[in-house]
Amino acid sequence: MANKKVTFREDVKSPAIRKLKQKLTPLKIKKGRGKIQKHIQKTLQKMKEEEESENQSPGTTVEETLTEENISTDKEETSKLENKPKKTRKTSGETIAQKKSRETVGVEVLKTSEGSSKMLGFHVSAAGGLEQAIYNARAEGCRSFAMFVRNQRTWNHKPMSEEVVENWWKAVRETNFPLDQIVPHGSYLMNAGSPEAEKLEKSRLAMLDECQRAEKLGITMYNFHPGSTVGKCEKEECMTTIAETIDFVVEKTENIILVLETMAGQGNSIGGTFEELKFIIDKVKVKSRVGVCIDTCHIFAGGYDIRTQKAYEEVMKNFGEVVGWNYLKAIHINDSKGDVGSKLDRHEHIGQGKIGKAAFELLMNDNRLDGIPMILETPEGKYPEEMMIMYNMDKR
């Protein structure tokens, strides 16, 4: 019988997959064993998808992730979000020289941060195991960081193994990283305010699972996008449902705080105003288990101008009066490609967008923000450099 050579997709970039590819390509598989070839191809595709998901950061949306439920029914808005360039820095497959270079930069970041009470970080990769997120964060000079506690592009997951938990706690002991400075990001598949019963149930169970995983890791906060009406219900109904989702998770967890993220007001999304977040908080039964994360790009695009000291103080005063400073648990640090009030959720490097450096200098010198996780979600490639820029803005 004729032999058949195994073929591979050319777009497979993962070092791990390339290594497996090199081992398997020379194999000759008989036609009668076609099932083996299919199994190999399926395994390779699964590995590729898992690695892509582990290295995807907030805002790095892809077609499989975006649904009408979790963003909006507005095709133009969905297109904007699909094209976001933000990705977490990849560290898998790096050479020893690259690793040393990365760690050297991390040391410089920590030196620059000396004397500052601000806790800067970014969304880090957990490729290779959740504990790698801690090692990566420490290596690059993070004082705080965001991550995904599971593959955020699929609904179904295996339970978290004891080995995963043990490896995580080993990394915590070795790095002494403060667990209250880790703010995992919820899956984009979820819509905590969905008007459709089936999607709502799946979202609630997914959020509960992610929060229970976070608690096993000693993490105290969980950040998520509030939700969307998807054009099928009134905002008040959607916000009430979001509060009920929070209550559902709180009742089945011990102490994790569910942190609502401010949104840009795009499409049918909830969270574009401080008043909407306040409405949700007022409906939540246990107030100590809910909080807010201010995203600088989102509030700016939503109409909150923070570019001058006067404007900044007015916005912060408004937040304190409407929501309350006691609910502020984290900040996402991003410049904006869109202008104030544009409702365009597109992040930009610090000082290179429409917000400008002045606003971030005000943030870095605001005593009310000391000790709060401040997480960069700017486009990939400059996180350590941007953290040093930010720390140098702290003049206190």
Swiss-Prot record:
Region (Disordered): 31-100
GO MF annotation list: 3'-tyrosyl-DNA phosphodiesterase activity; DNA binding; DNA-(apurinic or apyrimidinic site) endonuclease activity; double-stranded DNA 3'-5' DNA exonuclease activity; phosphoric diester hydrolase activity; zinc ion binding
Compositionally biased tracts (Basic and acidic residues): 72-85
Keyword rRNA-binding carried by entry: no
Cofactor(s) needed for function: Zn(2+)
Protein residues bound to Zn(2+) 1: 185, 225, 261
EC class name: hydrolase
Subcellular location: Nucleus
Pfam families according to UniProt: AP_endonuc_2 (PF01261)
EC number(s) from the headed UniProt entry: 3.1.21.-
Keyword vocabulary terms for this entry: DNA damage, DNA repair, Hydrolase, Metal-binding, Nucleus, Zinc
Intrachain disulfide bonds: none
Family as reported in the entry's similarity comment: Belongs to the AP endonuclease 2 family.
Record-given protein name: Apurinic-apyrimidinic endonuclease
Record organism: Caenorhabditis elegans
Lineage: Eukaryota, Metazoa, Ecdysozoa, Nematoda, Chromadorea
Designated gene of the protein: apn-1
